[in-house]
Curated annotation (Swiss-Prot):
PROSITE patterns: G_TR_1 (PS00301), G_TR_2 (PS51722)
InterPro entries: EF-G-like_DII (IPR053905), EFG_III/V (IPR035647), G_TR_CS (IPR031157), P-loop_NTPase (IPR027417), PrfC (IPR004548), RF3_C (IPR032090), RF3_dom_3_sf (IPR038467), RF3_GTP-bd (IPR041732)
The protein's name: Peptide chain release factor 3
Keyword Transcription regulation: no
Coiled coil: none
The tr-type G domain, residue ranges: 9-276
Function: Increases the formation of ribosomal termination complexes and stimulates activities of RF-1 and RF-2. It binds guanine nucleotides and has strong preference for UGA stop codons. It may interact directly with the ribosome. The stimulation of RF-1 and RF-2 is significantly reduced by GTP and GDP, but not by GMP.
Length: 522
């Protein structure tokens, strides 16, 4: 085994997905605690105290208590190198989340045990399932009264079509929570006990010693009944199915009280896969431990350091080893680029990195070379990773600078924020209008907030409302086709498209111009 292969096998790169408020950021914090990265976990609820979650680093995230960008955090744990991508739960930021899911080898799905599977979780699950990567489930908020565990397991199959296999089982919940029956490790983990007293061994029949006080508790007896039912009618643990994404190991716990999180993390590190091969150049397989360095840009973030007004391109290394000063080729342009400055992350904090391997996420200081979806490679052979998803916006607004004397900062801010990919920029086809398009309303609020706070440029947004965006072949375009109901604009690449007032306006256009072909993005 080569040193590179050995290093790659230590990597565990995963994203955490959930519906807003299911506790995703809190469980991330607890993992960082176990990784020795932070001394205390700050939950979103603590925002009045000025104590914020490590992964919520942007000013607007701290102000509103929601994650709106994907954070990257890295730490060592049990001889493994952990790379966590904490994705935004808010549905308006699904673009950032979808792209992030292209850069991971596994996903952790956090579910509120009182609510079960919620719409955003379902949406994100579909993307992960499509990729065929393993999914690990953490049923959170066991410190509150919630739904029956058997119902939660059944819901995984009913709503998501994936087998759930219980790795542990609650002994009570809410105020009556006593502990977890740890099926995988044949022990009971007691709630609110210190390390030495936390675990009670089970005998070969899966039962506590009779002199244990908990053994006489009716909640424990009820749990044993559930365990018997699981053995008879539940799914059998199958690692092969897990790695294919056909079965999900299910762990119960409470991220807020840090209960069951360590057990979950230990199991995850052992079960989750190391970086896998990628399909490149259309249909070629590229091994993660291939000696030639390559990777792809899945995210661009401006102003991670507000003092320097910088831009960072986040790169998932797909193969080989990164070394400081390495010369690579940018596949899109064929131009050589020397990678002198690379960084690793703890949210907005960063550390200079001199080497990294497949599976790692590195940040490259970007002076405008990179775009989301770019492939880079160090060898002579061109390597191009699959295109990342791009979404058709649904809401559009005209944007102007409030202060006409600040056009320079207005243009700089707008261009940098657009390059991050959460909001898209269009120009009037025969006017100088700037039009922004986004998947949801919150993206405009974030844009406006960041323009003011990061670029000192207040903007005015004039709504065009919900529009149906459809691209048109330039050869078929006649500017006279445009009207107030189907606004003609061009995208960042200069490609023409119509913004239809509604589906009816689109149908009317198609009836009038039956030979014109209109296309949409994702």
């Amino acid at each position: 085994m080569t040193k590179l292969t050995d290093e790659v096998k230590k990597r565990r790169t995963f994203a955490i997905i959930s519906h807003p408020d299911a506790g995703k950021t809190t469980i991330t914090e607890q993992m960082l605690l176990f990784g020795g990265v932070i001394r205390s976990a700050g939950t979103v609820k603590a925002r009045k105290s000025g104590h914020y979650a490590t992964s919520d680093w942007m000013a607007i995230e701290k102000k509103r208590g929601i994650s709106v960008t994907s954070s990257v955090m890295q730490f060592e744990y049990q001889g493994k190198r952990i790379n966590i991508l904490d994705t935004p739960g808010h549905q308006d930021f699904s673009e950032d989340t979808y792209r992030t899911l292209m850069a991971v080898d596994a996903a952790v799905m956090v579910i509120d045990s009182a609510k079960g599977i919620e719409p955003q979780t379902k949406k994100l699950f579909k993307v992960v399932k499509k990729r065929g990567i393993p999914i690990f489930t953490f049923m959170n908020k066991l410190d509150r009264d919630g739904r029956e565990p058997l119902d939660l397991i059944a819901e995984l199959e009913d709503l998501l079509g994936i087998e759930g296999v219980a790795m542990n089982w609650p002994i009570g919940m809410g105020k009556q929570l006593k502990g977890l029956y740890d099926i995988a490790n044949n022990r009971v983990e007691l709630y609110r006990k210190d390390d030495d007293d936390r675990y009670l061994p089970l005998d070969k029949n899966g039962k506590l010693a009779e002199d244990e006080p908990l053994a006489q508790d009716s909640l424990y007896q009820s749990t044993l009944d559930d365990i018997d039912l699981l053995k008879e009618a539940g799914n059998t643990f199958d690692k092969e199915k897990i790695l294919k994404g056909d079965q999900t190991p299910v762990f119960f716990g409470s991220a807020l009280t840090n209960f069951g999180v360590e057990t979950f993390l230990d199991s995850f590190v052992n079960l989750a896969p190391a970086p896998q091969e990628h399909i490149v150049n259309g249909d070629e397989k590229l091994a993660a431990d291939d000696p030639e360095f390559s990777g792809f840009v899945f995210k661009i973030q401006a102003n991670m350091n507000p003092n320097h007004r910088d831009r960072i391109a986040f790169v998932r290394i797909g193969s080989g080893e990164f070394k400081k000063g390495i010369d690579v080729t940018l596949a899109r342009t064929g131009k050589p680029v020397r990678l002198n400055n690379a960084t690793e992350f703890m949210s907005s904090e960063r550390v200079q990195v001199s080497d990294a391997v497949a599976g790692d996420i590195v940040g490259l200081y970007d002076t405008g070379n990179f775009q989301i979806g770019d492939s880079i490679y160090a060898g002579k052979k061109k390597i191009v990773y699959p295109a990342l998803p791009q979404f058709t916006p649904e809401i559009f607004m005209r944007v102007t600078a409030k202060n006409v004397m600040k056009q320079k900062s207005f243009h700089k801010g707008m261009n940098q924020l657009v390059q991050e990919g959460a909001i898209q920029l269009y120009r009037g086809y025969s006017t100088d209008d700037y039009i922004l398009g986004a998947v949801g309303q919150l993206q405009f609020e974030v844009f406006s907030f960041r323009m003011k706070n990061e670029y000192n440029s207040e903007v005015e947004l004039h709504t065009l409302g919900n529009r149906v965006a459809r691209w048109i072949n330039p050869d078929q375009l006649d500017p006279k086709m445009s009207s107030s109901r189907n606004l003609l604009v061009k995208d960042r690449d200069g490609e023409p498209l119509f913004l239809f007032e509604n589906a009816f306006a689109e149908r009317w256009f198609k009836d009038k111009y039956p030979d014109v072909e209109l296309t949409s993005r994702l």
